[in-house]
């Protein structure tokens, strides 16, 4: 049972490869012993029917040499030769045309009745595959003779200049109309010779003005700047233009030195009316809790033993090195000190009137 299912699967793969024009897959399946005259159970089509339907002349020639029957009928009574729209395939099938004057009939499909099938196969509903290349008659002859086959260079349909043929040095020219390719070349993601199109011979590369790059670029972009590329020929090729300047926009104040983390620190003391922050710098390579505590105490003139905790405003407690590593530039921190009688900050600070123990709120509201 499994062998029968595998055999049907191989036959279906052969019909699909013939419909796609994949001559290598067709040869591989035929050489492995797949029946070239096997028919689909629904519509009765063989691999030769599909090759004629899609006008793959090379596949048709190979199937006929492999013993494909060109007289097999489908469930609608169609022979393979009736499904093709090209005269060269009809000649391969052995059908001679009486009227050979008009060459425009080669690409005219024959009118056929609409399919009566309840469904449309996937390879029929989506016939175009961009990676499938249909060889021409010359390529067919080269493949049969054992020579290499290369796709011929054809000009683009939109009127743009043709791409560089292999073996010729790329010339400096205009970029394609697609701005995405231009952006990729300017950003350095794609090499310039592969994205530049060839220009007519009368066009010569002229001087290109390079915009001056100021020293402030290091403040806007963390990406190291690339040296400008020269337009002089190097080993017979022209290098592309210099990458475009793309500033890095930062929401908020931007630190001057990227190696340092700038923080705002103060001592928590609600008794003082003016309790300003000071800025400290930490090395980004040493973002640890002990280093933060050491720098804060050194800058504020506080003994580390007096620090009870470090608070990230408004209400987050810093406890370990990972908390310090998550800090951003210009975040506000507060050192909470232990309250004691020997604390010079709290001893000298003048408490407000409402915090004194002898303050009477009811008496303050009386009117005399």
From Swiss-Prot:
Gene3D superfamilies from the UniProt entry: Ankyrin repeat-containing domain
Ranges of Pro residues composition bias in the record: 149-169
PTM annotation (N-acetylmethionine): residues: 1
Keywords, comma-separated and alphabetical: Acetylation, ANK repeat, Repeat
ANK repeats: 9-38, 43-72
A Pfam short name: Ank_4
Compositional bias per record (Polar residues), positions renumbered to this chain: 212-224
Keyword Protease: no
Residues that span the membrane, as ranges: none
UniProt feature, compositional bias: Acidic residues: 95-107
InterPro entries on file: ANKRD40, Ankyrin_rpt, Ankyrin_rpt-contain_sf
SUPFAM superfamilies listed in its UniProt record: Ankyrin repeat (SSF48403)
The UniProt record lists the keyword Ribosomal protein: no
Region (Disordered): 93-115, 139-176, 196-238
Listed PANTHER family: ANKYRIN REPEAT DOMAIN 40 (PTHR24192), ANKYRIN REPEAT DOMAIN-CONTAINING PROTEIN 40 (PTHR24192:SF1)
Protein name as annotated: Ankyrin repeat domain-containing protein 40
Organism: Homo sapiens (Human)
Gene that encodes it: ANKRD40
């Amino acid at each position: 049972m499994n062998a029968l299912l595998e055999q049907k699967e191989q036959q279906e793969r052969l019909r699909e490869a013939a419909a796609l024009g994949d001559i290598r897959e067709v040869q591989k399946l035929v050489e492995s012993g797949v029946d070239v005259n096997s028919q689909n159970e629904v519509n009765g089509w063989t691999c030769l029917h599909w090759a004629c339907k899609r006008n793959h002349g090379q596949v048709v020639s190979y199937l006929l040499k492999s013993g494909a029957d060109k007289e097999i009928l489908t469930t609608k009574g169609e022979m393979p030769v009736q499904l093709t729209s090209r005269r060269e395939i009809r000649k391969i099938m052995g059908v001679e045309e009486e009227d050979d004057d008009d060459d425009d009939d080669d690409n005219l499909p024959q009118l056929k009745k609409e399919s009566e099938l309840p469904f449309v196969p996937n390879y029929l509903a989506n016939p175009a595959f961009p990676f499938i290349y249909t060889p021409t008659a010359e390529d067919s002859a080269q493949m049969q003779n054992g020579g290499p086959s290369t796709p011929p260079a054809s000009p683009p349909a939109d009127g743009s200049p043709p791409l560089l043929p292999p073996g010729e040095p790329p010339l400096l020219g205009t970029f394609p109309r697609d701005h995405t390719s231009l952006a990729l070349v300017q950003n350095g993601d794609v090499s310039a010779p592969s994205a530049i199109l060839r220009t007519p011979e009368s066009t010569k590369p002229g001087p290109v003005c390079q915009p001056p790059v100021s020293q402030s670029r290091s403040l806007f972009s963390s990406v190291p700047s690339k040296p400008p590329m020269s337009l002089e020929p190097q080993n017979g090729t022209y290098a592309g233009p210099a990458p475009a300047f793309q500033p890095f926009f930062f929401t908020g104040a931007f630190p001057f030195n990227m190696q340092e983390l700038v923080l705002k620190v103060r001592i928590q003391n609600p008794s003082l009316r003016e309790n300003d922050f000071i800025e400290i710098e930490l090395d980004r390579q040493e973002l640890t809790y002990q280093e933060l505590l050491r720098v804060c105490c050194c800058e504020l003139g506080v003994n580390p033993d007096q620090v009870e905790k470090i608070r990230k405003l408004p209400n987050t407690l810093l406890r370990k090195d990972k908390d310090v590593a998550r800090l951003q530039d210009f975040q506000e921190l507060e050192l909470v000190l232990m309250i004691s009688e020997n604390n010079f900050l709290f001893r000298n600070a003048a408490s407000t009137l409402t915090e004194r123990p002898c303050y009477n709120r009811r008496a303050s509201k009386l009117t005399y």
